[in-house]
Amino acid sequence: MPQRQPQPAHPADGIYFGLMSGTSMDGVDGVAVRFEAGRAPVVLAEAFVGFAQSLRDALFALQQPGDNEIDRESLAANALVTRYAVCCHELQRTAGLSRDEIRAIGVHGQTVRHRPERGYTRQLNNPALLAELTQVDVIADFRSRDVAAGGHGAPLAPAFHATVFGAPGETRVVCNLGGISNITILPGAGGDVRGFDCGPANALIDAWATRHLGKPYDDGGKFAARGTVHAALLAALLDEPYFTAPPPKSTGRDLFNPAWLDAKLAAFSQVAPEDVQATLTALTAVSVAREVAQHAPGCKAVFVCGGGARNPVLLDALRHALREAGVPATVDTTAALGVPPQQVEALAFAWLAYRFTARQPGNLATVTGAAGNRVLGALYPR
């Protein structure tokens, strides 16, 4: 008699892809991961697919209102999804998977507007096209249900962070340094998981490097390391209501963009470019450290993920800012917990796809401010 195949512990168990292109807009990170109920996720493959400068320019242009937006948005979405499909094919090849072995692709899309105070958030995407190009089920549009329930739609990663990084008896902070910085506070003994956006990170650091170096980012923080923090400029940058607003809160390029920076710099025209870069790096560190000091003063360890985890100057600035804020916490990357920092966000969206398939909530209302926990996402069948 033929042997019966072992059944999964949960009907949603299986292999999922997660795709994330963040506010840095340099490319898409992808992971292939196996989820089984009651077990730690197992990463089978990872990939990064960069965006051409023409696509980056189109995405940046859509961050602000302009003419002919519907046409430009649709064309950019199609170009974006072709890169997503390349990433999926690379994951499939690296992991040695057939299409039928992949339960679903969880794809975030590219945020071009985030205005929850007006009741909407917009992630550029064409999940129907991605399903057609990959012949795999696609789960997308994770943020809108939380916004519909009165939440900010962000951050969504804290529920995943709590599942993977939480530790009994130890208060930890997971800090994502992407285009925008955000933190997840994982209480060690009771209490709610909390999380929110702190302010700008690589969005401004990268923009300044592009303007003055002609490079997409400040490689290793070397540009910032050549400069000195300008105290008066730092104070002016921190003089922004968002930094003192209570959570739940979220932000993005709608606020923290080159136009915002230029307005702040108008009174500091004599500050050298490298000093501005050092000050932007300090801005990221100080805005995070102040929030940790206020909301997780007993934190003993901060674990960093996102692109900023590859910037040692930024990590040192964060250590210094935490000491100045009176927080005796160590700073390391999530690699110390077994998850490479470049995988964390893509893993989170694979996990959200897994949660959708199981029809389990993906948000934390205590984080986003929604009326309750909700199942997030929409299915686009293969």
From Swiss-Prot:
Q: What EC number(s) would the UniProt record show?
A: 2.7.1.170
Which residues are noted in the entry as ATP-binding?
A: G22, T23, S24, M25, D26, G27, V28, D29
Question: Ion transport among the record's keywords?
Answer: no
Q: Which GO terms describe its molecular function?
A: ATP binding; kinase activity; phosphotransferase activity, alcohol group as acceptor
* Pfam annotation, one family: AnmK
Which InterPro entries does this UniProt record tie to the protein?
Answer: Anhydro_N_Ac-Mur_kinase (IPR005338), ATPase_NBD (IPR043129)
Note whether Kinase occurs among the keywords. Answer: yes
| Entry keywords, A to Z | ATP-binding, Carbohydrate metabolism, Kinase, Nucleotide-binding, Transferase
The intrachain disulfides are: none
What pathway is this protein a component of? Answer: Amino-sugar metabolism; 1,6-anhydro-N-acetylmuramate degradation; Cell wall biogenesis; peptidoglycan recycling
Coiled coil feature spans:
none
One GO term under biological process is: peptidoglycan turnover
Catalysis: reaction(s): 1,6-anhydro-N-acetyl-beta-muramate + ATP + H2O = N-acetyl-D-muramate 6-phosphate + ADP + H(+)
Q: Which HAMAP family match?
A: AnhMurNAc_kinase
Q: Which PANTHER family match?
A: ANHYDRO-N-ACETYLMURAMIC ACID KINASE (PTHR30605:SF0)
Free-text function comment from the UniProt entry? Catalyzes the specific phosphorylation of 1,6-anhydro-N-acetylmuramic acid (anhMurNAc) with the simultaneous cleavage of the 1,6-anhydro ring, generating MurNAc-6-P. Is required for the utilization of anhMurNAc either imported from the medium or derived from its own cell wall murein, and thus plays a role in cell wall recycling.
Q: Which NCBIfam families match?
A: PRK09585.1-3 (NF007139), PRK09585.1-4 (NF007140)
Q: Which family does it belong to?
A: Belongs to the anhydro-N-acetylmuramic acid kinase family.
Question: What protein name is recorded for this chain?
Answer: Anhydro-N-acetylmuramic acid kinase
Q: Which organism is it from?
A: Burkholderia cenocepacia (strain ATCC BAA-245 / DSM 16553 / LMG 16656 / NCTC 13227 / J2315 / CF5610)
Name the gene behind this protein.
anmK
